[in-house]
Amino acid sequence: RGCGTAGCRRTWRGRPTAVGRVALHWAAGAGHEQAVRLLLEHEAAVDEEDAFGMNALLLSAWFGHLRILQILVNSGAKIHCKSKDGLTLLHCAAQKGHVPVLAFIMEDLEDVALDHVDKLGRTAFHRAAEHGQLDALDFLVGSGCDHSVKDKEGNTALHLAAGRGHMAVLQRLVDIGLDLEEQNAEGLTALHAAAGGTHPHCVRLLLRAGSTVNALTQKNLSCLHYAALSGSEDVSRVLIHAGGCTNVADHGASPLHLAVMHNFPALVQLLINSDSDLNAMDNRQQTPLHLAAEHAWQDIAEMLLIAGVDLNLRDKQGKTALAVAARSNHVSLVDMIIKADRFYKWEKDHLSCRDLSDPSGKSLSFKQDHRQETQQLRSVLWRLASRHLQPREWKKLAYSWDFTEAHVYAIEQQWTGTRSYQEHGHRMLLIWLHGVSTAGENPSKALFEGLVTIGRRDLAELAVASVGAYI
């Protein structure tokens, strides 16, 4: 029923939703031709925008409803409209891959700018590449669009396709001849973008096409850095196989630093196996082990310790990794580092217990011992520390077993109350047990000799009697 009053027109317009959508928007977006015609007959505002600046014409292009688009154009809709993000009809159709709509826009509408940019500085060509719309991209190329244009961040279509992992589009762009080494405003190449986006297939494609594997950004970050930041083992493996450098020379964070910092254990192991510099220092003079100690990453710390990291290196504050762990009260890590330090000092003076002929090397661990075969002895050591050793005696015993001042100081940083010395002594004894077990020594004999050395023969005889069954 026709009505020309303002109130009736408001009824046909419909009440706007929270995002400013009215009836014509919904009808155009859904492709309801009859509803669109009816609304237009009742004087619905053809160019009315929603909260995002999208009108019925833009929505029909976005959803690919060519017939609706034609109806709206014939009803006087403004064809040079754009959303608040700067999206034109061409942007909308290209991003969603609607080639028939693109063809109508280019062939039937007047004065359409093929390379018009949105608020990000991106053309329809950028949008098609970024969203993996190969057919739309081919249409735009055939229409003569600018291939090399950059957005406001300096990205080419190659950057955008690589970063999103669109293989088919990426291959087409490579075939077209886009510059593989073109850098964006931060110095990233398309290979950086593919690596950071964790797209190993795109990384392989670009490397085969001739991308430089060790290209650096303005912050001296390689593609392997970006793979490490995202924790991608697959991308890292591809880059390393292609000659990607695992180290840096300017005291920046290495890929290993980044993998440790973000707690990617499997990637850390891959980088260790790929001859990464375990002792590389970042701009705080921290090694990867310093970072593991700071964040209490036990699994990663063990990998680094087993790999043979230098435990004597100090950061800008003059702290070793042991001191960092102690300061942060990461008790388990403190004990692991002390075990490793004592092990490597023992190893230096003896045949390597990690020799291929020696199976003990295959199970080397510095973590807390939970083995069934040592349970009885560990119980004896706990009773010794908690019931029999006097407050200062654990330290005398530690020094007799070649614990260093740094070791003892690190253990003492833990505070559990006035009887903290009991826990300190227990931890020291467990660290000692790790050493004698690794060395293949008789723990009963070594414990007896140690207690006698500090003047506690009575306790030595008691302890040996307690562990007799274990021996």
Swiss-Prot record:
Gene expressing this chain: ANKDD1A
UniProt domain Death: residue ranges: 379-467
Source organism superkingdom: Eukaryota
Gene Ontology annotations of biological process type: signal transduction
Alphabetized UniProt keyword annotations: ANK repeat, Repeat
PROSITE patterns: ANK_REP_REGION, ANK_REPEAT, DEATH_DOMAIN
Protein name: Ankyrin repeat and death domain-containing protein 1A
Residue ranges of ANK repeats: 19-48, 52-81, 85-114, 120-149, 153-182, 186-215, 219-248, 251-280, 284-313, 317-346
Ranges that cross the membrane: none
Entry-linked CDD domains: Death (cd01670)
One Pfam family this sequence matches: Ank_4
